[in-house]
Amino acid sequence: MKKQIIAACLLMMQTASWGKVVLPEILSDNMVLQQQTEVKLWGKAKANAQVSIRPSWDNRTYTATSDKDGKWIAKVQTPQASYNAYSITFSDGETTQLNNILIGEVWFCSGQSNMEMPLAGFWNCPVAGANETIATSAQWKGIRVATIEKNGQVEPVDNCKGSWKVSCPENAPAFSATGFHFAMMMNQVLDIPIGIINSSWGGSTVEGWLPRDIVAQYPDINLERDIRKEEGHDWWHYMSPTLMYNGMIKPLQNYTIKGFLWYQGESNVGKHKTYAERLKTMVELWRKEWGLGELPFYFVEIAPYGSSENYYSALLREAQFNAQKIIPNSGMISTNDLVENYEQYNIHPKDKSNVGKRLAYMALSKTYQIKGIEAVGPVYKSMEIKDGAALLSFDNAGGGFNRMTDIQGFEIAGEDKVFYPAKAELNGGQIKVSSDKVPTPAAVRYGFRDFKPGNVANIRELPLYPFRTDNWE
């Protein structure tokens, strides 16, 4: 904390004595700015000074006046996306210039370790195909990534570390694997530059990405205990409420973006009853503070992990699925089919390519309105009990399913609430589920345990979302 205060004082002294425009780190060489809109540019200068901003794409001079603390902000009109490299010159008497700027689409990634997970992987946790992805990364000249350093703060701050990097083998190992694969698909389809801001922290809870005044209302959160202001406790920051919001969200809210991508939830397992509403609150707050309307919010279902007997994370997945129903302009992709059996106790599954692609399909279909792209897999609709079997109907399965035999992931129970592995077979456009041990079915579940991967998808290979027909405790 003392080091942070000293650094802040030095920055203020430099600004006052040099009179040179100081920009936040997120405004840097190589950045991508959102196309065809008014983007915000901001920073510090001398107190009550006029700052001029001159982008090379229109050679127009925009002006802003700093306040008594030297803070200023301006809005600048951006052109249509292209691969032309631009510059922006800032001056309050002395000049600062940013170079190699692209105009395109900017997406903000956040969450915990599965969003943070870089192409280089974690210890004993590789990313599938990473070496090839890294080796060929320089071909993606239109992709730029800004990785925000972990920055837990007790109070909101104005700046955080993390500047834009071009895509190349030297830089790519540090890129979010999910974010980069999202960007690759988006760049291929839209053929315009894609910018990714990755502000994630492994192990973080949803409460960590909310401000103090909201978290203070939650009866299960003790701020004085959970924040722990004392110095020397940086290691636990990822589990603390509000700290990520203060240090990794608040400093970035002036940056104009197209939408949010979210991969989080593992650290909220066991708190499924509050998760959907708190995620909704977070999205509402972020949208309000960015001030860009109802920005799209697409998120990832937590992957199968842990015991095949328990269902704590299954309840969290159910809360995630329900969250998309109460969050406007949102959607969730499933990962139930993307985990190998040997990854049962690996909370960081290796397949990040399909996670990124599925997020891209959702953005391309819903946000960019590209017809013909499917983004949502089958969703449980209804159940009929007939002749000792459960006949299940689904939405988003009009073309049928991806397999005719060896259907896995289903369980069935009678009124005794004891679930048994079930036989599942196609029955026209339905799936027929039964078990010799359950003569009179009452409920069916699919993928509804901590680790219960399934293999059902529609003919676009988008997986069936885990579900249960019951509401038993």
Q: What do these predicted regions represent?
A:
Residues K20-E473:
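Cell-envelope and extracellular/periplasmic
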